[in-house]
């Protein structure tokens, strides 16, 4: 097995460990969820070994093991706040901005057409969201974790199973390299952060843990993404979003322009089952021009493409109700997509994973890593942390025709009617918009939507008339009026 990264080559002295005994934690998966879990465990153990089947690059680069690697990614303010809490002194935000990541204040820097109309741009600069390519975000988190946690190392290895019993996990089994024999790696703690492709349930079956309930809700979303060079004269063009309409009874269609590093736009088109975006470049442009607003299409028609169109259909919502298992092994926790996976169109996966890692860190700090029942307690807390993102994604996706795995209940329809009223109010009310952004950016649980101020605006509607078009600045209008197709 090759060591791909090491945070530091110096030894960690027993004095630095404090009361830590010589014990090892193993984290399966080297993405943001896994690295943040490693940071959560590092203060309580002598060594954290992060295992990933990919060779993790030294610089930002796409890798095969990340199905959404070439599509748009947002790091919500709720997720960023949690990551910085988990990584004190790492200056994650500063690292990412220095590497070229962009920051967008949803309140003032976003052009967004909702099904209920155009959102206004307010003078308040709040709900700052970071946008960058997935490779840059992942690299930034990885370097921040490794540079500030000398007990964490990363190895390239493929995990083929768990070791232990239904009562306690004692390590992992690694597939043999180059056809060689398998290797057993002892561990006092194991965290599964292996993502959408997790094999956790079959591994638990082998240990004697059976009957874990799963739910899958698939709207059939296909994501098509192409990267463009930002046209001259538009270096600060705001993030632009045309949202899908879940209330129309027709397959949803959406488009977004996300500013990313190196003077580029990442343009993602989304279509639910029956309205999937195409891979052909000419058809990709035509699809964008035929969205409810042609703004995304007009902008990319004038931009230089920097590659082909990448399509992904790995977009379903999946949840494993691990917290309800009748029997749960000590010293095993699953976080991130290994526990609950969300439709990536909502941009909440990375932030939800951070919330799960924080739940692990808080539990270890409060109860001690050897506390009986700690793994089950953490798993239940992880489930609560993911509930908001799951509810938001699934309650919307079940409204689309052709959805698999669920149909809207009466409660879903009532929630949809309320959501539509609140969205309409948010087009003309900063207070109502803040309620939506609080929830969609994972700063607060969904109950925030039913606070008195949000309820009042949902009942009374928008206090301002609907906008007839996107709220552009004078400079943006001049740029748009002078657009010419790129050749």
Task: For every predicted segment, state its role.
Residues 7, 361-487:
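C-terminal helical "tail/cap" subdomain of flavin- and related membrane-associated enzymes
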Residues 1-25, 43-45, 55-56, 483:
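Extreme N-terminal leader/targeting segments of oxidoreductases
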Residues 261, 275-389:
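FAD/FMN-dependent oxidoreductases across multiple families
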Residues 148-287:
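Predominantly flavin-linked oxidoreductase catalytic cores and closely associated redox partners
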Residues 70-140, 225:
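Active-site-adjacent segment of FAD-dependent monooxygenases/related oxidoreductases
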């Amino acid at each position: 097995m090759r060591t791909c990264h090491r945070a530091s080559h110096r030894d960690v002295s027993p004095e630095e460990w404090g009361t830590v005994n010589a014990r090892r934690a193993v984290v399966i998966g080297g993405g943001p969820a896994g690295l943040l879990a490693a940071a959560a465990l590092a203060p309580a153990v002598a060594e954290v070994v992060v295992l990933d089947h990919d060779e993790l690059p030294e610089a930002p680069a796409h890798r095969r093991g990340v199905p959404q690697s070439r599509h748009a990614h947002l790091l919500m303010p709720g997720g960023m706040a949690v990551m910085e809490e988990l990584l004190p002194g790492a200056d994650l935000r500063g690292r990412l901005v220095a590497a070229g990541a962009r920051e967008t204040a949803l309140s003032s820097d976003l052009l967004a057409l909702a099904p209920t109309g155009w959102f206004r741009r307010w003078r308040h600069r709040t709900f700052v969201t970071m946008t960058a390519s997935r490779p840059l975000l992942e690299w930034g988190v990885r370097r921040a974790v490794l540079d500030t946690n000398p007990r964490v190392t990363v190895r390239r290895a493929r995990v083929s199973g768990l070791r232990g019993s239904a009562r306690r996990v004692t390590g992992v089994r690694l597939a043999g390299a180059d056809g060689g024999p398998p290797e057993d790696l002892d561990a006092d703690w194991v965290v599964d952060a292996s993502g959408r492709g997790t094999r956790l349930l079959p591994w638990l079956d082998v240990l004697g843990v059976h009957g874990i309930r799963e739910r899958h809700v698939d709207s059939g979303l296909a994501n098509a993404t192409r990267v463009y060079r930002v046209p001259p004269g538009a270096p600060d063009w705001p993030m632009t979003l045309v949202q899908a309409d879940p209330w129309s009874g027709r397959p949803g269609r959406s488009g977004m322009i996300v500013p990313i590093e190196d003077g580029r736009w990442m343009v993602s088109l989304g279509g639910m089952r029956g309205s999937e975006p195409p891979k052909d470049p000419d058809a990709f442009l035509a699809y964008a021009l035929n969205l409810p607003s042609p703004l995304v299409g007009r902008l990319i028609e004038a931009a230089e493409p920097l590659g082909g169109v990448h399509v992904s259909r790995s977009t379903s919502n999946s949840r494993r109700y691990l917290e309800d298992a009748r029997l749960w092994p000590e010293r095993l926790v699953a976080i991130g997509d290994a526990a609950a996976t969300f439709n990536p169109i909502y941009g909440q996966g990375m932030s939800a994973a951070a919330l799960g890692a924080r739940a692990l860190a808080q539990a270890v700090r409060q109860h001690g890593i050897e506390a009986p029942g700690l793994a089950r307690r953490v798993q239940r807390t992880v489930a609560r942390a993911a509930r908001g993102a799951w509810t938001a994604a699934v309650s919307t996706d079940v409204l689309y025709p052709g959805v698999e795995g669920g149909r809207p209940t009466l409660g879903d329809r009532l929630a949809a009617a309320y959501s539509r009223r609140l969205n309409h109010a948010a087009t003309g009310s900063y207070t109502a918009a803040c309620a939506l952004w609080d929830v969609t950016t994972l700063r607060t649980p969904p109950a925030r939507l039913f606070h008195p101020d949000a309820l009042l605006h949902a009942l009374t509607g928008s206090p301002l008339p609907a906008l007839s078009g996107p709220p552009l600045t004078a400079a943006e209008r001049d740029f748009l009026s002078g657009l010419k197709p790129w050749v």
